[in-house]
Amino acid sequence: AGGEAGVTLGQPSLVEQDSHSGFKNELERDGGLLLIAGNESKLKHILILGNKIDLVKESQAKEQYGQILAFVQETVAXGATVGQVLGAVGALPEIFTELXIVNIGSLSTGGQVSAVKADLGKIVLTNPVXTEVGEEKSVEKHWRLIGWGQIR
């Protein structure tokens, strides 16, 4: 599926659980959460962004900042800028809606979240990927989105 075809994701607001249980903050983003392995050697110019920062107390925000710095220490993300995404819904620059890497089987491609409705999100792929309609896959390998997708 590629071009206007897309991957429909189940549960677009997703939370990391098992392998990083020490990182206890609940992380959500409308449309999904992309977690990048800290040992991914090809990444450069990393920004670590959080949202909904206005919903926590200043002391909690400082504690979370420290947890993030400790979490990425001795990884390719050590020294990365840590900041927050602030802005009214629909008022953020377009780049914040285009941060998706999608694994389908053993293939990876870019994608853009084009729609979110209830517990489904639609991602339009940037390049064609060979697969079959109805195929269900867990997202895996280096780029991980906690959850699953079904080709439609």
Curated annotation (Swiss-Prot):
It is found in: Cytoplasm, Cytosol. Coiled coil: none annotated. GTP binds at N51, K52, I53, D54. One of its GO terms (biological process) is formation of translation preinitiation complex. The modification N-acetylalanine is found at A1. Signal peptide: none annotated. One of its GO terms (molecular function) is methionyl-initiator methionine tRNA binding. InterPro entries: eIF2G (IPR050543), eIF2g_C (IPR015256), Transl_elong_EF1A/Init_IF2_C (IPR009001). GO terms for cellular component: cytosol; eukaryotic translation initiation factor 2 complex. Keywords: Acetylation, Cytoplasm, GTP-binding, Initiation factor, Nucleotide-binding, Protein biosynthesis. Eukaryotic translation initiation factor 2 eIF2 is a heterotrimeric complex composed of an alpha (EIF2S1), a beta (EIF2S2) and a gamma (EIF2S3) chain. eIF2 is member of the 43S pre-initiation complex (43S PIC). Interacts (via C-terminus) with CDC123; the interaction is direct. Belongs to the TRAFAC class translation factor GTPase superfamily. Classic translation factor GTPase family. EIF2G subfamily. Member of the eIF2 complex that functions in the early steps of protein synthesis by forming a ternary complex with GTP and initiator tRNA. This complex binds to a 40S ribosomal subunit, followed by mRNA binding to form the 43S pre-initiation complex (43S PIC). Junction of the 60S ribosomal subunit to form the 80S initiation complex is preceded by hydrolysis of the GTP bound to eIF2 and release of an eIF2-GDP binary complex. In order for eIF2 to recycle and catalyze another round of initiation, the GDP bound to eIF2 must exchange with GTP by way of a reaction catalyzed by eIF-2B. This is Eukaryotic translation initiation factor 2 subunit 3. It comes from Oryctolagus cuniculus (Rabbit). The gene is EIF2S3.
